[in-house]
Amino acid sequence: MASAASVTSLADEVNCPVCQGTLREPVTIDCGHNFCRVCLTRYLEITSPDPEEPPTCPLCKEPFRPGNFRPNWQLANVVENIERLKLVSQMDLDEEDVCPEHGEKVYFFCEDDEMQLCVVCREAWEHRAHTVRFLEDAAGPYREQIQKCLECLRKEREEIQEIQSRENRRIQVLLTQVATKKQKVISEFAHLSQFLEEQQNILLDQLEKLDEDILKHRDEFDVLVTGEIGRFNTLIEELEEKKERPARELLTDIRSTLIRCETRRCRKPVAISPELGQRIRDFPQQAFPLQREMKMFLEKLSFELDYEPAHISLDPRTSHPKLLLSEDYQQARFSYKWQKSPDNPQRFDRATCVLAHGGFTGGRHTWVVSVDLAHGGSCTLGVVSKDIRRKGELRMRPEEGVWAVRLAWGFVSALSSFPTRLTLEEQPQQVRVSIDYEVGWVTFANAVTQEPIYTFTASFTQKVFPFFGLWGRGSKFSLSSQEGAATLS
């Protein structure tokens, strides 16, 4: 069955161009256009054309002969069929609003049974005690509920789309970082390859020199040994001949002969001199600098591939009056004695904390904090957002713009939404703090053993600053962009 929309579209195609209604007794003129017979007759009467000039088509303005329009029976049949389709389509629409049980039009809605009712259904005993409303009245609250659901769904969809966009940005940042690291590795290993080739040539030259010295000593040794063997052969032949002579000849000069044999001492030549042997034994030590260079190279490459060392200093404008800063602003010590400091807006007045200068709005940065806690003391390390609360109580958790860990006497805690005591192999004395702004990571690790401590995941939208908190008489910390930061003396 044709839909109402398709029937309406088809009916528009058989409208009269004059009256804009459905063609009645359609007739065709010379140009091929169709009109109602009555409409075309009236058109000819109104225009009253000059007998010398033929009338023109109302649609295309082509002239036609007034007595030459003819009935279009085929089009008339099409119009009749379309009229029937329109009627059937209307009946189908009406049937949708009819009660299937009683054949009456549906006007009501039972909220208890969630049923659509006609007048007869409305008066039935099973619905008399129910809440029954007109369809439009009943639909109103449901429309409102649907609207609320739509608002919630759209909001959740926007949140998911925002998450998708943010995560896609993070992925792109990571891909960019990987590409950069690839180039870094290629470049560094190209330099390493050149360095190794140079070192290889140096070591091979040294080995070649040792080889030449050994061969030289071998030749000298062969000459010396050959000479000694020749002298011994001569003496042996002389004695063998002496031994076979008669007694009178044997005893002639026998004493000098024996003395010459007894005083003859064999010089025991050495093929490899002690000095050359020591050079051979010492050769592996020539590779030690190479091993050290390799270790330093790998450590440097690993560090540079991770983060850019941040050369930070403490900001005295933010320091709590109980914190004593060094002149170079690289160290801080807790003191119960209040320092004379102006109460400017940037300064913490209750939390014994201090920020670093500068802050970050992007990139990957790292710094090391050496911590020396007195008994019962604590030190808080991390990053905070630019608008962190400076006056009054400071709640240290991510919701307040604080991503930090706290080192206390004997334990370490992550200051997440609910502080979490961490299990570590050892209490860190030096902590590496690292931030990847675009990816949203704040990472803590033992700067000596490289043991991971904790990682926060965040979404930074404004500048963040390195953050430090300190408590306990005698507790102190110092800063460094590299490992091995010195503690306060």
UniProtKB/Swiss-Prot annotation:
<feature type="zinc finger region" description="RING-type">
    <location>
        <begin position="16"/>
        <end position="61"/>
    </location>
</feature>
<dbReference type="InterPro" id="IPR006574">
    <property type="entry name" value="PRY"/>
</dbReference>
<dbReference type="Pfam" id="PF00097">
    <property type="entry name" value="zf-C3HC4"/>
</dbReference>
<feature type="coiled-coil region">
    <location>
        <begin position="142"/>
        <end position="245"/>
    </location>
</feature>
<dbReference type="Pfam" id="PF00643">
    <property type="entry name" value="zf-B_box"/>
</dbReference>
<keyword id="KW-0175">Coiled coil</keyword>
<keyword id="KW-0479">Metal-binding</keyword>
<feature type="binding site">
    <location>
        <position position="121"/>
    </location>
    <ligand>
        <name>Zn(2+)</name>
    </ligand>
</feature>
<dbReference type="GO" id="GO:0061630">
    <property type="term" value="F:ubiquitin protein ligase activity"/>
</dbReference>
<dbReference type="Pfam" id="PF00622">
    <property type="entry name" value="SPRY"/>
</dbReference>
<dbReference type="InterPro" id="IPR000315">
    <property type="entry name" value="Znf_B-box"/>
</dbReference>
<dbReference type="InterPro" id="IPR001841">
    <property type="entry name" value="Znf_RING"/>
</dbReference>
<dbReference type="InterPro" id="IPR013083">
    <property type="entry name" value="Znf_RING/FYVE/PHD"/>
</dbReference>
<feature type="domain" description="B30.2/SPRY">
    <location>
        <begin position="292"/>
        <end position="486"/>
    </location>
</feature>
<comment type="function">
    <text>E3 ligase that plays an essential role in the differentiation and survival of terminal erythroid cells. May directly bind to PTEN and promote its ubiquitination, resulting in its proteasomal degradation and activation of hypertrophic signaling. In addition, plays a role in immune response regulation by repressing the phosphorylation of STAT1 and STAT2 in the interferon/JAK/STAT signaling pathway independent of its E3 ligase activity. Mechanistically, interacts with the intracellular domain of IFNAR1 and thereby inhibits the association between TYK2 and IFNAR1.</text>
</comment>
<comment type="similarity">
    <text>Belongs to the TRIM/RBCC family.</text>
</comment>
<protein>
    <recommendedName>
        <fullName>Tripartite motif-containing protein 10</fullName>
    </recommendedName>
</protein>
<dbReference type="GO" id="GO:0008270">
    <property type="term" value="F:zinc ion binding"/>
</dbReference>
<dbReference type="GO" id="GO:0005737">
    <property type="term" value="C:cytoplasm"/>
</dbReference>
<keyword id="KW-0862">Zinc</keyword>
<comment type="subunit">
    <text>Interacts with IFNAR1; this interaction prevents association of IFNAR1 with TYK2.</text>
</comment>
<dbReference type="InterPro" id="IPR003877">
    <property type="entry name" value="SPRY_dom"/>
</dbReference>
<dbReference type="InterPro" id="IPR050143">
    <property type="entry name" value="TRIM/RBCC"/>
</dbReference>
<dbReference type="InterPro" id="IPR003879">
    <property type="entry name" value="Butyrophylin_SPRY"/>
</dbReference>
<dbReference type="InterPro" id="IPR018957">
    <property type="entry name" value="Znf_C3HC4_RING-type"/>
</dbReference>
<dbReference type="InterPro" id="IPR043136">
    <property type="entry name" value="B30.2/SPRY_sf"/>
</dbReference>
<keyword id="KW-0963">Cytoplasm</keyword>
<feature type="binding site">
    <location>
        <position position="99"/>
    </location>
    <ligand>
        <name>Zn(2+)</name>
    </ligand>
</feature>
<feature type="binding site">
    <location>
        <position position="127"/>
    </location>
    <ligand>
        <name>Zn(2+)</name>
    </ligand>
</feature>
<keyword id="KW-0863">Zinc-finger</keyword>
<feature type="zinc finger region" description="B box-type">
    <location>
        <begin position="94"/>
        <end position="135"/>
    </location>
</feature>
<feature type="binding site">
    <location>
        <position position="102"/>
    </location>
    <ligand>
        <name>Zn(2+)</name>
    </ligand>
</feature>
<dbReference type="GO" id="GO:0045087">
    <property type="term" value="P:innate immune response"/>
</dbReference>
<dbReference type="Pfam" id="PF13765">
    <property type="entry name" value="PRY"/>
</dbReference>
<dbReference type="InterPro" id="IPR013320">
    <property type="entry name" value="ConA-like_dom_sf"/>
</dbReference>
<dbReference type="InterPro" id="IPR001870">
    <property type="entry name" value="B30.2/SPRY"/>
</dbReference>
<dbReference type="InterPro" id="IPR042784">
    <property type="entry name" value="TRIM10_RING-HC"/>
</dbReference>
<dbReference type="InterPro" id="IPR017907">
    <property type="entry name" value="Znf_RING_CS"/>
</dbReference>
